[in-house]
Amino acid sequence: MSATIQKQKELFGHPVGLYVLFFTEMWERFSYYGMRAILVLYLVAQTTDENGGLGWSNGEALALYGWYTMLVYVASIPGGWIADKFLGQKKSVLYGGILLVAGHSILAVEQMWAFYTGLGLIIAGVGMLKPNISTMVGGLYKQGDIRRDKGFTIFYIGINVGAFLSSLIVGYVGEVHGWHYGFGLAGIGMALGLIQYLAGQKHLKYVGNYSGTSDNEEEKAAMKRPLTKIEKDRVVVLFISFLLVIVFWGAFEQAGGLMNIYASEKTNRMLMGWEVPASWFQSLNAMFIIFLGTTVAAYWAHRKLKGKVSTSLFKMIVGLIIMGTGFFFMTAAAGQYETNGSSAMYWLVLAYLFHTVGELCISPVALSYITKLAPLKYASLMMGVYFAMTGFGNKLAGLLGEASESLGEYTIFTGIAVFCVVFGLLVMLFRKKLEHLTHGAEDNEREMLETEGYEVADKDIN
């Protein structure tokens, strides 16, 4: 895809198209995380409450949460396949956005048919949009352009600006004024994102187009020929790295499920005489990403300048270990609850801080890694597989949350912490062998950094 990029208008050292995708994804994540922030709380709220919910048990709510968040991301596989085979990423993102606006809007209707229909449309919409917009970000950069990782970090900050705002705004509206008002507000956010995406099409002229109609002969040939030995090896590495992804998200997504309920039911949320809404704690992750995103990216860039290990696989392993360490704070919170009958808010804050640093080391890095290693003909499909692995991690999170009803939070939090750290150290033992199979996919970045500095695309305006 990136080979077709000829001339791009730039802003702050990156293609303007990056910021179009930044705001599109920001509003998409505003709608998704806003709805996610109140979904479980809506399910478990008693029907007799002033702001009545469905009155489900914690186990039932977490089971639905697990299935929903899994299917949202598993749908990325057909979404990526449709883009590769028929539509291209650009049109797929458009159709996904339309489905999302419809899905979130229907959730505002207070009927069970609307609830399940809305969830179904959101699943289809995210499947069409999520893998393809990420692939388009990679397509904005020429092969070997060292700005690619930083571009994905900027894009990732956009995701979390949306998540931060939605957890506060949609969370507040849903908990205080009514769950369905919150769902409707999420739909308005997605509509704004869709309008912004359509308005910025002139900056996305060279990315996301269906490769079957490409004028580039090299791209046409790449779409038809079988995979080479190098491409097959790189795909193997990607699939192994996806194991890290499943484990990471299986632990991390306790945020929307078990940790969300824990904040609501077992945490002392009083602050100067005012009770902090439980859904607001989910905004901590996004807030930390906004403030720490560029710092973490700069740290890894500094390591690369110093010639220290800073490969994508190394970053992902370190991210998993850091995130796992954060769960020891939740172990402490559960221990405090068993002793005192409630736990302090600072345990949640510390846990989210470590989870965020871990996420910054693994999630945007994994997105960039896929655009480096995936064969052109399967670019969106491989991105879809990545998000499907995220979905399986989400389902795992739901199962772990359900298990807490019988095993207890202390056991679950401690088990997650220990497993993540040990699994990360185990993969670290095989890191060099796995990186050998990438056949130097990231080597050119270092060479460019040492000899040329940043590769700057043409500034001519199309």
Positions of predicted regions on the chain:
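Intracellular loop-helix junctions on the cytosolic face of multi-pass helical membrane proteins
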Residues: 1-20, 143-146, 153, 171-274, ...
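Hydrophobic core of transmembrane alpha-helices in multi-pass small-molecule transporters
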Residues: 26, 103, 114-129, 339-361
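Short amphipathic helix-loop junctions that connect adjacent transmembrane helices
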Residues: 37-60, 255-281
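Central cavity-lining transmembrane alpha-helices of secondary-active solute carriers
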Residues: 62-83, 283-296
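Conserved MFS/SLC helix-loop-helix module at the cytosolic interface between two early adjacent transmembrane helices
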Residues: 75-109
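Cytoplasmic membrane-interface "Motif A"-like loop-to-helix N-cap segments
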Residues: 85-97, 302-321
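C-terminal ends and interior cores of transmembrane alpha-helices
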Residues: 98-116, 318-340
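Glycine-rich segments within core transmembrane alpha-helices of 12-TM secondary carriers
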Residues: 147-175, 182-193, 285-289, 380-397
